[in-house]
Amino acid sequence: MLSLKAAFAQHTRNNTRKEKARLLKLSINGRFLTQSLTGVQRYAAEIVKAMDGLLASGNAAPQLLDAEWQILVPPAATTLGELRRIKVKQVGTLQGHAWDQIDLARAAAGTRLISLANSGPVLHRDHLVVIHDAQVFKRRDFFSRKYLALHRTLGRLLARTATIATVSTFSRNELASVLALDPASIPIIPNSAEHFASVEPDFSIIESLRLEPHRFFLFVGSMTKNKNVDTAIRAAERLGRADFPLVVVGGDNDKVFGGGATQSSGGIVRAGRLKDEHVAALFARAAAFVFPSLYEGFGIPPLEAMYFACPVIASSAAAVRETCADAAVYFDPLDADELSAKMRERIDLGRISPLEQAKQRERLATYSWTKSAAAMLQVLAKPVRQIGPDGTAR
């Protein structure tokens, strides 16, 4: 027979096990750490780091502070740096969507799963998935047929089994339409440009590219149909100012988009992929940032430009207007002549004015990774799919 002391110890252990079993367990889909860095992967990384900071400082609902947190990653994943509350765990042997649907699904079983980069296990029920836009439904001309078929199917299946979140009011309405969802059921958890706060500009790139400060226009983005670099290049050619070249920063992605890169021509400086320190320097020294996207779910690069007080000449796409408001000048992204005229106006205006800078600061203050992470934690603190009429957790 157990002594009173031993019985008490066993009772305590049993209660501890029961308490641990009752704790909320949350898993983050870390597949984005194996992907090339675009706005989607940037979003996922910054949200994870900001959530970790809030959890470490005690700024979350009690059940989330007491919860077990982990980010599940495939083999060969990059690192996020030091995380204080979220444990990193490598799982599985597969890659890509197979890892999502098999390895991750198995490892995340019984936990609340957060997928921040457009896809995740379609059979996992307690699941929050951030889908950043509705491009695969609205602009089929941007993608290969194989990519369209896969991602449309994923989107429709996830809409049935998971809570869908997104990054803007525009994207919420688009996704609600194509996925037959109530817009009020889709939380909005936006992007930010705060990641550049820790980036020290490396101005050596100005000399390396043989540029004159404040005498060049800047495009930053992938060479894809959606990013519409062709219009920017045609506008620069029609501008006819060799002393104000267009610097094109970014890489290609033919595998996904079936081709879309444009060849270099006169007055164009093709810089290729650059590290953040060089991009920051170009933002800080450009005459203006040109953003001709045909379709966006949010539009991070204009905010990044504003962070360095760079004037923004942006596409009139709805999500871009939502993000930039009156802190940018707009043009029809299909009209190279209109963009060329806006570039000429910027040359005539010269450096950014105090009023323009004030408008930029107002837009930047609207968006914060910490605010977005707090919104994410608010949603995660509630039962799955329990979303209020304004798109926030109830």
Predicted regions mapped to residue ranges:
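Carbohydrate transferase catalytic cores enriched for Leloir-type hexosyltransferases
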Residues: S3-R394
